[in-house]
Amino acid sequence: MRLPHNSNNLAYVRSLRKNMTDAERNLWYEYLRPCPYKFTRQKSVGPYILDFYCASAQLAVEIDGSQHYEPQGQQQDAARTAYLQAFGIFVLRFSNRDVLLNLEGVAAEIERTILMRIFK
């Protein structure tokens, strides 16, 4: 299934790719970029931009800053997750801190989820 996207976001998506957070950069270069399952950075899906997306596993990987743990951020994340789930996309969320301090554990969880979704 082809996912909807907002073509008006293209310049913003390019900007996000050039200006990744430290956590996003670490995860991308240390694990996702060399991963045998192809990931896309800053994937536009409908009104949202996913930090990382693996089409073969229909998996979104989100790296969350502190604003995601405030009530408004949690409500927005819940709406975003529900929207993505309607397209069969599973969302994995990690904090910036998790990625920076436990990259190996984060990578293991991503790999476990990919294998579970592809070979279900």
Locations of regions flagged by a protein language model:
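Nucleic-acid endo/exonuclease domains
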Residues: M1-K120
